[in-house]
């Protein structure tokens, strides 16, 4: 990591169908279907919409043998329609399904947390991928580490890295380099730390696999875009990332413009900003520079604060260097002027530029100077950036998955309904998850959870504890509100 100037991390080339990532190629954007993988027409239509929007890589879940075999029909239909989209299978739990999927798709994603390896399954999959020219993604999820790793390391960034490196070492020993790796979490601080630790671990073992970036369960609307931009932007500012997915609880094609905006935003970052005291900074250890309890926004009193404004095309490096070079313990407000006219563009760019300074404990206040926007609109964006960076909580936080073919209900409508009933509960975190694969783990720090258990059935959580199982979906929202009331966390709107 170069603290003084922007440079992309060197990585090897990996071919995913027609798309090549790593090796200095442009950062690729991608998405994932949320249709039933057994529904060939619906999946093909959604893949084609994503491709037309600019997403050249599309992933589908294959949770069983039937879904794995139907990938052949989906790929065939997409090709017949004239699309050469790179198609990826997402596998959990069943190595046999990975072997089926590898016969048809361009890349297979497996999760070390739930992929069996005791009988040479990984080596067999590598051999199959090599023979067919199929790429492999080692995709670690914070919410689904194996029991063995969890018992030793807990659900920590270090545990995520241990999980990934075990699989990457097998790939290296097999001489297989068509590998991509990811370290996803809904917690931006965990996610950024995990990726940075992974890069350190790979560098130490001379590994140069391309990296797939993403924040899981970011939610929807402007909040979801800001949360993704804070996490992904923090790493892209470090030069990390060869392909990205902005996970939103919306139509998958809505993710593509946000991802493309981030790629374009980091495409050119000139300027060199020497850091005189690099010992004051650790990319993998969170520590606050000051003891300011609650970071401020620009409309709040800033007596005794030092305001530092970025004026270059590389605001993150400029501000970081200026803060690290300060010879005063005064708290710092970071300021940046934007000429944007779109609220979404302003929010994404500001989150990508400034969020990392709070993730790293360097900044104590945020000031977005945007003449085209009302003060209240700017203030709301600033507060959402601080919340996404996990330094100040000012509104209800929703940990909501983007949904996929495993999702057991209409998650977009459900999230909207949950928000309409609970958005006034400012100090709560509420998880709304499509299924049990990553749901309970990814929402582990949520106060309450709403998780799909079976078609038309919902399980409710208080923290990590199941409170009610298999509730009829039509009753689940009222029961969630009752659960919040029963635990003393409800206030009248």
What are these regions (language model features)?
Residues 1-31, 130, 268-299, 416, ...:
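N-terminal amphipathic alpha-helix/helix-capping segment at the start of soluble metabolic enzymes
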Residues 24-42, 61, 85-93, 113, ...:
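Active-site mouth loops of central-metabolism enzymes
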Residues 85-87, 92-137:
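Hydrophobic or amphipathic alpha-helical targeting/insertion segments
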């Amino acid at each position: 990591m170069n603290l003084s100037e922007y440079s992309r991390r060197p990585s090897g080339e990996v071919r995913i169908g027609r798309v090549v990532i790593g090796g200095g190629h442009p950062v690729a954007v991608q998405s994932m279907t949320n249709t039933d993988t057994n529904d060939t027409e619906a999946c093909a239509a959604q893949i084609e919409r994503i491709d037309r929007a600019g997403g050249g890589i599309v992933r589908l879940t294959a949770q069983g043998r039937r879904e794995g075999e139907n990938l052949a029909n989906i790929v065939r239909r997409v090709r017949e329609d004239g699309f050469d989209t790179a198609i990826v299978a997402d596998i959990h739990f069943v190595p046999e399904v990975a072997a089926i999927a590898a016969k048809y798709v361009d890349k297979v994603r497996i999760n070390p947390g739930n992929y069996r390896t005791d009988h040479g399954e990984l080596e067999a999959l590598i051999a199959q991928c090599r023979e067919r020219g199929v790429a492999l993604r080692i995709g670690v999820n914070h919410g689904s580490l194996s029991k063995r790793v969890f018992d030793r390391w807990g659900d920590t960034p270090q545990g995520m890295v241990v999980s990934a490196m075990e699989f990457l070492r097998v790939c290296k020993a097999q001489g297989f380099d068509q590998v991509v790796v990811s370290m996803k979490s809904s917690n931006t601080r965990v996610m950024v730390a995990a990726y940075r630790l992974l890069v350190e671990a790979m560098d130490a073992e001379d590994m140069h696999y391309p990296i797939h970036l993403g924040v899981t369960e970011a939610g929807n609307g402007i909040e979801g875009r800001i949360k993704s931009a804070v996490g992904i932007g923090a790493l892209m500012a470090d030069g990390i990332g060869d392909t990205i997915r902005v996970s939103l609880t919306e139509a998958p094609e809505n993710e593509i413009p946000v991802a493309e905006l981030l790629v374009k935003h980091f495409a050119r970052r000139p300027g060199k900003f020497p850091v005189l005291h690099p010992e004051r900074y650790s990319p993998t250890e969170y520590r606050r520079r000051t003891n300011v309890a609650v970071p401020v926004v620009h409309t709040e009193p800033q007596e005794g604060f030092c305001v530092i404004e970025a004026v270059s095309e590389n605001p993150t490096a400029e501000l970081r260097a200026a803060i690290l070079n300060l010879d005063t313990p005064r708290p710092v407000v970071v300021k940046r002027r934007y000429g944007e006219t779109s609220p979404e563009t302003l929010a994404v760019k500001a989150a990508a530029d400034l969020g990392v300074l709070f993730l790293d404990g360097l900044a104590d206040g945020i000031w977005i100077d945007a003449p085209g926007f009302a003060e209240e609109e700017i203030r709301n964006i600033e507060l959402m950036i601080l919340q996404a960076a996990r330094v100040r909580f000012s509104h209800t936080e929703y940990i909501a998955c983007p949904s996929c073919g495993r999702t057991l209900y209409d998650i977009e409508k459900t999230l909207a309904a949950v928000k309409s009933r609970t958005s006034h509960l400012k100090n709560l975190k509420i998880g709304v998850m499509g299924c049990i694969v990553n749901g309970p783990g990814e929402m582990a720090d949520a106060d309450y959870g709403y998780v799909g258990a079976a078609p038309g059935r919902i399980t409710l959580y208080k923290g990590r504890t199941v409170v009610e199982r298999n509730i009829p979906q039509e009753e689940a929202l009222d029961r969630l509100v009752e659960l919040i009331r029963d635990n003393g966390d409800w206030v009248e709107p």
